[in-house]
C-alpha cells in the first residue's frame, strides 16, 4: 500500500509542478488570485465530503505558483453568493444556479470566479498604493477553440502545450466602481481563468 500511495503522491506532485509551470509561462505578467481557504474549517459530518476534501490540492497549487509568479489571497466569504452586477446577496437555486432578485439568474461558478477576480484587483490596487492598475490583455493562438460567449468549457491542462502570446498592452488606469463599468473598460474580450479545486481542469469563462 505504501508503494502505491507514494506513486500516487509523486504523480500528483508532478502534475502540480507541470500545471503551475504552464500557467506561469502562458501568463508571465499575470497576478494569480486564490481564495484564502482553510481546509480544516471546512470539515463536516459528511464522510464522503471530508474524504474528497482531504484529496484537494488547491493550497499546494497556490504555494507552487508563489515561487514562479505573483499570488494574492482574497476573502472567500460569499464569493458565490454576491451578485456581480448589483452586489446584493443572491439566493441559491438547485444545482449550479444562483438568483438575484434584481438582475436575474447566474452560473454559480462564473459568479465565484468573477468575484474572486474583482477582489483580487481591489487588493492589488491597495498593495500597489495607487488608484488603479495597468490593464493588459492576451490573445492565445491555437491554445483553446472559440466557444460561444458566456459558456463554460473544461479543458485538461497539457504540460506540452506551447503558445505564442501576442500581448496588447494598455497604459490606461482605472478605478473599480461597479462590474458593468469595469467590463466596458477593457478593449479586449474579458476572460477570467480559474483552476478547479482538485487541480484537474482549467476553467475558462468568457464574460458577456
Swiss-Prot record:
Alphabetical keyword list: DNA recombination, DNA-binding, Metal-binding, Transposable element, Transposition, Zinc
Protein known as: TnpB-like protein MJ0012
Record GO biological process: DNA recombination; transposition
Single GO MF annotation: DNA binding
Signal peptide: none
Binding-site residues for Zn(2+), renumbered to this chain: 83, 86, 100, 103
Pfam families: Cas12f1-like_TNB
Family under the similarity heading: Belongs to the transposase 35 family.
Protein species of origin: Methanocaldococcus jannaschii (strain ATCC 43067 / DSM 2661 / JAL-1 / JCM 10045 / NBRC 100440) (Methanococcus jannaschii)
InterPro entries: Cas12f1-like_TNB (IPR010095)
Domain of life: Archaea
Amino acid at each position: 500500500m505504501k508503494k502505491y500511495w507514494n506513486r500516487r503522491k509523486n504523480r500528483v506532485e508532478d502534475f502540480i509542478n507541470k500545471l503551475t509551470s504552464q500557467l506561469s509561462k502562458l501568463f508571465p505578467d499575470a497576478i494569480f488570485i486564490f481564495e484564502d481557504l482553510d481546509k480544516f474549517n471546512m470539515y463536516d459530518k459528511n464522510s464522503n465530503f471530508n474524504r474528497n476534501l482531504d484529496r484537494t490540492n488547491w493550497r499546494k497549487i497556490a504555494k507552487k505558483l508563489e515561487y514562479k509568479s505573483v499570488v494574492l489571497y482574497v476573502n472567500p466569504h460569499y464569493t458565490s453568493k454576491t451578485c456581480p452586477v448589483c452586489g446584493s446577496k443572491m439566493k441559491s437555486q438547485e444545482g449550479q444556479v444562483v438568483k438575484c432578485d434584481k438582475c436575474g439568474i447566474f452560473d454559480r461558478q462564473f459568479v465565484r470566479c468573477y468575484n474572486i477576480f474583482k477582489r483580487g484587483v481591489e487588493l492589488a490596487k491597495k498593495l500597489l498604493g495607487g488608484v488603479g492598475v495597468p490593464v493588459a490583455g492576451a490573445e492565445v493562438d491555437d491554445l483553446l477553440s472559440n466557444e460561444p460567449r458566456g459558456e463554460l468549457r473544461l479543458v485538461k491542462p497539457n504540460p506540452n502545450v506551447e503558445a505564442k502570446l501576442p500581448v496588447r498592452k494598455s497604459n490606461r488606469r482605472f478605478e473599480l466602481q461597479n462590474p458593468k463599468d469595469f467590463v466596458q473598460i477593457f478593449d479586449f474580450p474579458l476572460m477570467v481563468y480559474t483552476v478547479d479545486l482538485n487541480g484537474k481542469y482549467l476553467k475558462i469563462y468568457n464574460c458577456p
